[in-house]
Amino acid sequence: MSIIKTEHLTHIYSQGTPYERAALQDFNIEIEEGEFAGIIGHTGSGKSTFIQHLNGLLAPTEGKVYIDGEVVCAGRRDVGRFRLKVGLVFQYPEYQLFGETVAADVAFGPTNMGLPPEEVEKRVRESLRFVGLSEDMMEKSPFELSGGQKRRVAIAGVLAMDPKVLILDEPTAGLDPRGRDTILGEIREYHEERKNTVLLVSHSMEDIAQYAKKVLVIAEGKPAMYDTVENIFSRVEELTAMGL
């Protein structure tokens, strides 16, 4: 069953002005539930615009987006429901930390979902385990942690909401190779244990090849290819022509 589906999705920035630009054009894709898919494309191809439609941060100019069979539309009263289903981790998410303690920061999402305190605490502990942070970190201030640890706390805050779809936009940006491998390994472990759908946006073809099972290639606002890692990376000439 498709957990993500778009039909003729088009998004035009600054429509009706001299600065009008089509970021997505007649974008049609279906992604199966439980998939671990990498998303690649050169700068300006439409990657970020696409993922922001999946939890209603952006509304389509034309077309529809479906999550778990339901239409998503930014501005709808119940768009918050989709943001519980679709967890989005932006680049440098550590800049969004605000809790006095690590535990408070990670607990923010599930607490606002109305979950009982014992369930919130359980989710906080599980999420920190997934990102490789020990329980003795829970009462520390997130602002005293290293850059890599802050990144993991921010990711844990999204995992604690247990989204059906987890989207990570360049989650290892700015990290050293060791930190990058650690975080991506933890995300893979999370996927294998929870069986949730994971979309990983990355400029690193190496990371996509190592961790994803399928690859969505976006070019000029459209899905140019969507297939297994092996099949995509065998099309070297086409990828090179797209600047990848």
Task: Indicate where each model-derived feature is located.
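Conserved beta-strand-loop-alpha-helix hinge in the C-terminal portion
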Residues: 222-243
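Conserved ABC ATPase signature
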Residues: 141-145, 149
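Conserved ABC ATPase "signature" region
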Residues: 118-136
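Helix-to-loop junction immediately C-terminal to a conserved catalytic motif
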Residues: 55
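A short, surface-exposed alpha-helical micro-motif characterized by mixed small hydrophobic
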Residues: 208-210
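H-loop/switch region of ABC-family ATPase nucleotide-binding domains
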Residues: 202-203
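ABC ATPase NBD Q-loop/coupling interface
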Residues: 64-81
